[in-house]
Amino acid sequence: MGTEFNGLFDEWAHTYDSFVQGEDIQYKEVFAHYEDILEDVVNKSFGNVLEFGVGTGNLTNKLLLAGRTVYGIEPSREMRMIAKEKLPKEFSITEGDFLSFEVPNSIDTIVSTYAFHHLTDDEKNVAIAKYSQLLNKGGKIVFADTIFADQDAYDKTVEAAKQRGFHELANDLQTEYYTRIPIMQTIFENNGFHVTFTRLNHFVWVMEATKQ
């Protein structure tokens, strides 16, 4: 993942918060229990936290309120501008992405919500390998994102979206890189992690991976 999604992110920046509040009927189920999902990621994190895809700063704010030290990475200039308006003045957000980033200090937890699907499965593997080198034993990756239990679950979800006339959602599901749990389990385990998957709505699972 380089900068190919930046235009999309910049366009989405000013409407993202309305999306997560369920104002777009096509994405209402995707963002169901949104606040609970963020809280779950926060509760599973500890120490110095590296956040990928800060977006408009919703997860970042909760992490800071919970007392975490947060290093935010966000590729979109528009997203960074909106997040800075919502977050403490002293908080800085660095330009970067899942594969290209700088880390100022040692990291205990790496977090992200609704973003890892921008990477292909091969890129996901490269990213997790990088994170494995960053984290000490006991360090964690906590990602919340749309993934599917298997191919059948994916196929049924796409078909259901089409039948409901949710063509934008169906197109999204077919053009982004929403992966399957067995693929992610293999990626994590091959890179030295023990991982669990917890489903928090029809689309979103929380992946909690601990470095062994």
From Swiss-Prot:
<keyword id="KW-0489">Methyltransferase</keyword>
<dbReference type="InterPro" id="IPR023553">
    <property type="entry name" value="Uncharacterised_MeTfrase_YrrT"/>
</dbReference>
<dbReference type="GO" id="GO:0008757">
    <property type="term" value="F:S-adenosylmethionine-dependent methyltransferase activity"/>
</dbReference>
<feature type="binding site">
    <location>
        <position position="53"/>
    </location>
    <ligand>
        <name>S-adenosyl-L-methionine</name>
    </ligand>
</feature>
<comment type="function">
    <text>Could be a S-adenosyl-L-methionine-dependent methyltransferase.</text>
</comment>
<protein>
    <recommendedName>
        <fullName>Uncharacterized methyltransferase BCE_4457</fullName>
        <ecNumber>2.1.1.-</ecNumber>
    </recommendedName>
</protein>
<feature type="binding site">
    <location>
        <position position="97"/>
    </location>
    <ligand>
        <name>S-adenosyl-L-methionine</name>
    </ligand>
</feature>
<dbReference type="InterPro" id="IPR029063">
    <property type="entry name" value="SAM-dependent_MTases_sf"/>
</dbReference>
<feature type="binding site">
    <location>
        <position position="74"/>
    </location>
    <ligand>
        <name>S-adenosyl-L-methionine</name>
    </ligand>
</feature>
<dbReference type="Pfam" id="PF13649">
    <property type="entry name" value="Methyltransf_25"/>
</dbReference>
<keyword id="KW-0808">Transferase</keyword>
<dbReference type="GO" id="GO:0032259">
    <property type="term" value="P:methylation"/>
</dbReference>
<dbReference type="InterPro" id="IPR041698">
    <property type="entry name" value="Methyltransf_25"/>
</dbReference>
<comment type="similarity">
    <text>Belongs to the methyltransferase superfamily. YrrT family.</text>
</comment>
<keyword id="KW-0949">S-adenosyl-L-methionine</keyword>
